[in-house]
């Protein structure tokens, strides 16, 4: 489509039909397996080229809308059997984690709060706003406290060469230390790699009472090594 329209691939957008239900299911899934504060925002309205314009609507509302369009004679997309949406044959199998959450956990939560979808999505939006703000603060601290060893003016650093965290990072609030360290590790490991909580904690432990712990050494995921002295971590 981008080639047909004569625009760069980076300007392309993929629109999905994810709904409130999908977002709530993802929230419970992450609650069960564990996640960071940002993970509790669940699905985002936009992530790169992926856009999710229906996150404020329930799955049932979307289905009702399609049926109203069909019944009123307006254009809809349907398969040869007239189905307006496709049900995956595995949806009823509780061996799949999402299906278990969808069939067992969410319905019971809805019994306690019939407005669960609206309530929980509103909560996730509040979490997202605060997460965005903290991320902006962390970006500022990242620029202040992180020095890449291979950094050259006008060029992207060679992240695998390592970096130094300034001694003064230890004086920042622990939540901001973790966010800066998380970004550093993501840069070094690559954005396809999941940063382990233990790795973040191991680096933060190199600071104590607002300064680096001289002589501290440890190893992390991805064969990364950490050491600390009065010059930094």
Question: Model-derived features: where do they sit?
Answer:
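Catalytic subdomain that performs nucleotidyl-dependent activation
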Residues: 8-17, 21-127, 135, 143, ...
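Active-site catalytic microenvironments for nucleophilic, acid-base chemistry
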Residues: 4, 30, 108, 184-188
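Short intrinsically disordered, low-complexity coil segments enriched in acidic
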Residues: 1-9, 13, 188, 228-230
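Solvent-exposed amphipathic alpha-helical surface segments
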Residues: 5, 69, 73, 112, ...
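Structural element of the ATP-grasp superfamily
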Residues: 1-2, 62-66, 181
């Amino acid at each position: 489509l981008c080639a047909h329209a004569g625009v760069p691939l980076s300007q392309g957008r993929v629109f999905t039909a994810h709904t409130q239900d999908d977002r709530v299911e993802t929230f419970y899934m992450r609650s069960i397996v564990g996640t960071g504060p940002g993970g509790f925002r669940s699905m985002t309205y936009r992530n790169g080229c992926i856009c999710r314009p229906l996150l404020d609507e329930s799955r049932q509302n979307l289905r009702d809308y399609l049926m109203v369009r069909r019944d009123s004679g307006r254009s809809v997309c349907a398969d040869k059997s007239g189905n307006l949406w496709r049900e995956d044959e595995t949806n009823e199998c509780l061996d799949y984690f999402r299906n278990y959450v969808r069939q067992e956990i969410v319905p019971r939560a809805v019994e306690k709060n019939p407005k669960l979808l609206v309530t929980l999505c509103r909560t996730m939006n509040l979490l997202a706003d605060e997460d965005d703000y903290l991320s902006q603060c962390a970006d500022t601290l990242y620029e202040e406290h992180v020095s890449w060893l291979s950094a050259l003016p006008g060029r992207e650093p060679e992240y695998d060469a390592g970096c130094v965290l300034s001694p003064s990072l230890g004086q920042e609030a622990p939540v901001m230390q973790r966010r800066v360290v998380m970004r550093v590790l993501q840069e070094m490991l690559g954005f396809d790699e999941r940063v382990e909580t233990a790795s973040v904690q191991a680096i933060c432990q190199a600071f104590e009472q607002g300064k680096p712990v001289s002589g501290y050494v440890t190893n992390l995921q991805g064969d990364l090594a950490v050491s600390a002295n009065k010059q930094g971590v």
